[in-house]
C-alpha cells in the first residue's frame, strides 16, 4: 500500500480545490485502484486526500424482475464515458462473470439504454455524483441520482465495509441497524428533523422507515467512501426535442413556467437563464474563439427558458410543441425568436449554450482571483415549493438590486431551483454576497424550501443547514456521523462545523 500514498506536493495542487474555487490542505494523497486499497488507506490515515478517479472499472450487469438493466461500476467511472458506451451498446466486460455476460448479450439486443441523471458537468464521476446526490436539468422528469442507485459499497473510516442493496435494510422509525462485512452490527440513531417537500440535498436524507442505502447517497463523503455503485438504466427516449423560449421580462418567463408545467406531459427539463447570464454569453461569443459557435442572441432577448421534450415518437413531440407554443403566446413570449432543436446537431448546439454559462462564470472568477485570491464564486442552490416561485425570484431581484452586486442566474426553474451566482470583484463584494446568501437561506426556509437542492451543503454553506433545521438537528447529525466515523476524520467541515464535531468527540462522540 505504501506505493499508493504520496506526499501532497505542488504537483497535486489541483486536487486541493473544487469548482467553488475554494482550496484546502492535506499532508498526503492517494489514487487507489481497488476497494481493498481504499479500506487499507482509511484504516491508517487522516489529513489525506483519497482520490478514487482511477477506480473506473465496469464490474457487471444484471436484469431485475421487471427486466430493468442494473450496471455495477466503480466510483471513478466518468459520466460522459458512460453515456458514450451506452449509446454505442459497448461496455468493457473484462473480468465479468457468466451471468453478467449473458445479461450483456440481452443489453446489446435491447432498445438503447441511458442513465438519466444529467448534471451540467459531464466529466463528473459517478461516485461523486452519488456522494452529493447530483441531479441537473433532467431532474424535472427523472429526479436526482438517489432513485437510480440500487446498490452501494461504502468503506467506513476504520476500513470495514457496508454492502447495501436497495430494498433489503430499513429503519425502524428513526433507528437503523446495519451489519458490516466483518460481521459487526452498527446501531444508528437518525436525526429527527423533517425534510422539506421540495427538491432537496440539504444534510442527511432521513425519514421514518427509510431504506438504509438512502442515508449514504448525498452524505457528501462524511459517513464513508463509496467504492462501488449499482445504477439502474432506462430505455432511451425515441425522440428528444429542445425548445429555447425567449422573453423580454423575467415576470413573463416565470408566468410561462407556472403555466407550462401542468400542460406538458413529456417535459424532461425546464431550465432558465436570466439577463446577466445571457449578457455573459454575448461577451464570450465576441471575445473568445472558444465560444464563437454559440448562436447569436437577439438584442431583445432578456431571459430564456429552455424546455426539453422526451417523447415516444414525433407525433407526440409535435403535439407537445403545439401546447408549449400556445402557452408561450399566452405568457407574452417571442414566438418568432424561439429555437427548436429536432436533430442531434441542433441539440448539441443548445447543450453547448447551456453549459457555456457556468463555464464562463468560472473563467471570470479565475480571472478576478488573480487580483484578489481570497474571493470565490458564490452560487446559490436553493429551492422552494411550486407556489413560491414568483416570490423567491422577486426576493432575489429586490435584494440584488439593493446590494448593487453583479450576478448571473440560471438553473432548474421547473423545480423552482435557480442558481443565483454573485460575481464578487473584491473581498468586500464577497463578504456582502455571503451576507445576502444568509438572508436568502432564512427566507427560503420560511417559504418551506431547501438551502441546497442538488449540490449538497459542503463546507461553504454549512451554516445554512443550521438555519434550515436548527442547532439540535446539527448535533444529532454530527452524532450520527460519529457512530460511523468515531474520530470525525471523513469530510471534515462538510455539513456542520469542525468545532461542533470536535466538541462531541471530546465528550465521547455518539
Where are these regions (language model features)?
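Activity-critical C-terminal alpha-helical subdomain
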Residues: 462-510
